[in-house]
Structure formats: C-alpha cells, structure tokens
Design a protein with these regions (language model features):
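Glycine-rich phosphate-binding loop of ATP-dependent small-molecule kinases
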Residues: 1-211
Length: 211
C-alpha cells in the first residue's frame, strides 16, 4: 500500500509496482472517476466531495474496496493506491484482510513537502474522454492540449486547482497523517523520498519490497 498527500506520485509508483510484480493496481480515485464519468449514483455523491477537496466518506469507499480485494486476481497480492485514508478505513481494511487470512505487508509513505505538491498538481492534465492523465512538465502530451491515447481535449481538473489542492492538503494532514503512526506501530511502515526523479523513487520502493 502506498499513501501520502494528493499529488505525491503514489499513482505513478503504484502502476509501476503492479506491472513489475504482475498484481492488480487498486485505486479508489480511478474507481470514483469511472463512476463519475458513467453518471452513477455513487459517482454523483463522490464528485460532490472531490470537487470540494474533501475526502469521500468511508461508507462510500470501504465496501467497494473490500469487494475488489476479494476477487480472484488479488490472490497473489495487490497494491492499494489512495486507500485507506483514515484510521477507521485502515481498521476496516485490517479486519477484512483478516477474514480472508491476509495481512498488509508494507505501508509505503511517499514523502513530498506541501509546496512541491501544489506545484505538481497545478501541472496535471486529464483527458475529458478516456481519463488518461498527463503533466505539462513531467509527462506532457505529444500535442499540447490533446490526449495521446484518444485525441480528446485535456484539462486541469477541478480537484487539481490550487485552491482545491490547499483544501485537500488540510484534509490530508488532519485525517490521513495519523496513518503514519498507525502503520509504524504495526511495524510495516516504510518511507521514501518522493522529491527524487520518478525512476529513483521506484528503485527505492523495489529495494524495500525486496528486503
């Protein structure tokens, strides 16, 4: 499991880990955005919170994640990205894993200062059609403003705008930061410097997983 404040690069690293170890990448953010795009009731509820920079309530996330990790492709492991975000979610996850005789092996904290987060997220762009994500500095599109995958327009999402990012960071420090102590007490917390180049961050994570 990877966690940190929004924009710390968790998603990028989680996808690389999933590819290297051939395990599912489970991202609540992706699940919520898919539901928002499809106009589901869950998506409508989630969008209300996400647009305000607030965390989606536990009851809208826990059941969805618990169902996902019990699917067949998760039997050999999985990487969680963006969940749990609160102590109650972490406790619910531990309880669910215990029921299927599994435990969380690592909780990896991708450490990035707040000021870096605001700059990073301001450069994010997302495709209006397929949901692909880019960054104007770190991962730009081949044609400015156009998605490489489908050619549709790319935009700055509402939840990546500076004022929303500041709110999200405040929520993170209040609700998610305590997870550091929670997983430290379990002896599974590891930390990596998220300000390094992405390939170096990934190498540090692989080294941890190989311990």
């Amino acid at each position: 499991m990877l966690f940190r404040s929004p924009g710390a690069g968790k998603g990028t690293q989680a996808k690389q880990i999933a590819a290297k170890y051939q395990i599912p990448h489970i991202s609540t953010g992706d699940i919520f955005r898919a539901n928002i795009k499809n106009g589901t009731e869950l998506g409508k509820k989630a969008k209300t919170y996400m647009d305000q920079g607030a965390l989606v309530p536990d009851e809208l996330t826990c059941d969805l994640v618990m169902d996902r990790i019990q699917q067949d492709d998760c039997k050999n492991g999985f990487v969680l990205d963006g969940f749990p975000r609160t102590i109650p979610q972490a406790e619910a996850l531990d309880a669910a894993l215990k029921k299927i005789s599994q435990t969380m092996d690592y909780a990896i904290d991708v450490d990035v200062p707040d000021e870096n987060i605001v700059k990073r997220m301001g450069g994010r762009r997302a495709c209006l059609n397929c949901g692909a994500t880019y960054h104007i500095v770190f991962n730009p599109t081949k044609v400015e403003g156009k998605c490489d995958a489908c050619g549709a327009e790319t935009v700055l999402r509402d939840d990546d705008k500076p004022e929303t990012v500041q709110k999200r960071l405040s929520v993170y420090h209040e609700q998610t930061q305590p997870l550091i102590d929670y997983y430290k007490a379990q002896g599974i917390l590891k930390s990596v410097d998220g300000t390094k180049p992405m390939d170096e961050v990934f190498a540090d994570i692989v080294a941890i997983l190989g311990e």
